[in-house]
Amino acid sequence: MRSSADTRACGSGMSRRSFVTAAGVFGAGAVLAGCAKKDDTASSSALELDENGMSNQSLSTEPFAYDSVVWGGCHVNCGSRCPLKLYVKDGTVVRVSTDVDGSDDFKPGGIYQMRSCLRGRSNRQRIYNETRIQKPLKRVKGTKRGEGKYEEISWDQAISEIAEIMKDVKEEYGNDAFYIQYGTGQLGGTVSKSWAPDVTALARMMNCWGGYLRHYCDYSTGQITWELPLFNGDAWSNNEVTDLVNSKNIVLWGNNPANTRMSGSAMVWLITWVKENNPDANIVVIDPHLSDTAIGVGTQWVPVRPGTDPALVAGMLHYLHTEGRLDESFIREKFIGFYSDTFVDDVKQGEPTSNAFMGFDADGTLSIDEDMSYEAYLMGAGTYRGTGEKTPEWASSICGVPADTIRWLADLYMDGPTATIQGWGPQRHANGGNVTRSIAMIATLTGNVGISGGGTGAREGTGGVPYKIPANLPNFADRNSVETCISFFDWYQAIEDYTVMDDRTWGVRTIDATGATTYARKPGDIKLKAPIKFIWNYASNVMLNQHADVNDCLRIFNLPDEKDSGLRCVVTHDIYLTPTAMISDYILPATTSYEETDIIKGGTAWTGFACCESPAIDPMFECKPIYEVCRLVAAELGVEEDFTEGRTQEDWVEWLWEQGKEAGDDIGATFEEFKEKGLWKQTDEHTPAIAKPEAIKTPSGKYEVFSKQAYNLSKQWDLTCGGVIPDDGYDQITGLPVWYVAKEAYGDDAAMKDYPFQLIGHHTKSRTHSSYGNVAWLESVHPQQLWIN
C-alpha cells in the first residue's frame, strides 16, 4: 500500500482509498470508462487544505468550496479530446470535473456531453506529481547518458549553452543535423502542441533559423499509413461511426476502444450508443485477447493468433471464391490482380507512372509475365504451385480460428451490410502491411464499401462539427532548407551511421513545404546528407520507452561524438523525469496545460467544441511553456522577431481565434467573452458520412489486390538496410497481402522451439502510452499485468 505522503504529493482532493472504493462500486472498467453524470454545482461549505494546499475531501456528492472555475482539456494521445473543468482554491486545483452541458444522447442537432474518463479526471495527480521537473538540469560532465547524474543550472545558462551548441552544429553540419523528435505527450492544443513535430513551436523556431531534418509517418500508424494505400489509395477514410446503426454486422478487427478511446467524446461511447440503437446487430471482435470491448459490446469474440490475419482472410476468400459467392463482374471492373486470366494485363495498369508513387520503375525493367494473382495464391496455382489451396482448414492451422468459424465470418460479410473497423494493433507486426491490406480487402471484395452500414476496413470515422480555428501556429515550412526526410523510426541509425541511409536501404525521401514526400526516380538517388547531432525532445518519451530495443538505443546514445556518428546534444523539455529525459544533456521543466493559455478543439458525431484554456494556476517551480522556451532560444539565435512577430502566447491564441472567425466560425463573442466562458459548442444535423471512393488514388485507379508498387519495391530495396540487418529471409515485401512467417512470430519454428509463448502488447486503461503511467490512483485500480492464455 502506498503511504499517505504519496497521496499528498499528488495534490489530490480525493484519496486513493476513495478512488478505489469508487472502483469497487462501479467496477474498474466502469470507473475508467467514465462515471455516472452528477450535478457538480458548488456550495459554500468550507474545504480544508493541508499545509501543502492539498484537499482532504473524498469523491462524493458532499459540497465543497472553491474560488474559481477554469476550463482546460486532456492533452494526451488517446485519439480523442475531452474538456476538463478545474476548480481552484487558494491557487491550488482541488477538483477536476468534466463536461455536463447538454445531453448524453447522440442525435442530429443535439448538444451532447463530452465526459472525460477517469484518466482525464485524475489530472491533479499529474499537476502535483512528485516526478515533476522543477529546475533546468544539465548532465554532469564525464557521466554517461542514462546514468541520471545532473546538476541544477539557471535558465540563462541553459538557454545560452544550448544556443551555442546549436550554432556549432550548424556551422559544422548545416541544418540537416537537427531533428525534432516525435512526441505525443502534449496533443490537442495549438501553441503548446508537441505533435505533429512539423507544426509545433519548435518547428517554427527552427524554420526561422534554416530548418531541420523531418520525418514521415508515426509510431501509431507506421505500416497502415503507407501500405493500406497500396490497395485502395487511402489509409484513413471510413464511414462515420453513427452510420453503424444501419449495419447488420459490425466487425471490430483488432480494435479495442474500451481501452484506447474510452471517454465520452470517443469511440467507446459511440459504439455503446450504436449497440443501444441497433440491438440486433452482430458485433464481432477479432482480437488475440479477450478485450473489454469484446466483453462489453461484442456478441462474438474471434481469437486469432497475432500476425496471422492474412491467412484468416485467405481462408474466408477461398471459401467464397470456390462457392461462387463473389460478384465476379464487380471484381473484374473495380479490381486488378485478383483473377488469373487477366493478371498480366492487370499489372500493366498498376505500374507506377511517376515517383509520386512508391516503386517507380524508370527503366521499365520490372515487368511480370507469370501468374501471381490472388486467385492463383488461393488455389495453389501459377507462381504458388505446390503451396496448396488456402482452404479454411489450411487457414485454421495457422490463425487458430476454427474452419467453421472462418466460413461463418465469410458468410457474415456476404450477408451485409457489414462494417469493418480496423484498429492499429494488427499492423504492429513484422508483416503488418499485409495484415492491414488483407483486412481492407475482405471488406471491399464483398461489396461493403461505399454503402450505408458498410465500411472500408480503416479506422473509424468519428464525425464532429469542427470549429475553423487553425490547429497550429504558422510554421514557416517554406523556410526549411533540408530537403530530405527519414522514417519516424530510423533516427537512431542516423545517429550511428547515416552514410548507409538512402531511399533504397532506409526509405529516405524528399519532402516539400506542404509535407508531401516524393520517392526516388531511381534506387539510391536520395541520400541522407548528415548525421543527427542535435535532438529537440519535447513532450516525448519515445527514445527510451516507446521505441524498440531500448538497450541498444542506450548504446547508441553513448557513442562518442565523432564526425559521422554520435550525438552532440539532446534537449528534453517535459513535465516529468521520464526515462527519455534521463538520457538528455539538458532537461528543461515544462508547464502543464493547466499553467498556460491555449485553445483545444474536438468533437464527435453531431457536436464540436472549442475550449479556451486559461491558466488554472501559476507556473509551478521554474517551469516554462514551450513557446517561451523557443522565444528565449530564438533570441540567442538572432531570430526572435521572426519567431514571435511581436506576439505573446496569449496574443497568438487571440490571433488564432480571430482567424477562426474570419474563416466562418459563428461564435458571436469577443475574445474576452470567449476566454471567460471557456467552453463553446456547436451542432448540426448532417447525415453520417459514407466513405465513397469516387477516385481511387492508386496507379490503376482501381483497387489493387496485387500491388505493382510493392512488387517493384521488393526488387529495388535492400532489405538488409545496407548490411545492418541479417539477410535471414524473414523480411519480405510482397505484391499480394499474403501470410508469411515473420521473425519470432507464429510459424517461426526455430523461435517457437525455445520460446513457445508469443509476447504481444496491448493498451491498458490506466495509461495512454506512458502518459498517466505515474498516477498512483489509476495504477491501484488497474495495475500493469501480464495476461497469458
Question: Which stretches of residues belong to each language-model region?
Answer:
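A cross-kingdom feature strongest in bacterial/archaeal respiratory oxidoreductases
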Residues: 11, 70-71, 89, 177, ...
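Acidic/polar loop patches that form or flank catalytic/metal-binding clefts of enzymes
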Residues: 95, 214, 326-330, 405-407, ...
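A glycine-rich phosphate-binding loop feature that marks nucleotide/adenosyl-phosphate handling sites
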Residues: 183-184, 334-335, 412, 455-466, ...
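Long, well-ordered, tryptophan-enriched scaffold segments
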Residues: 277, 289-415
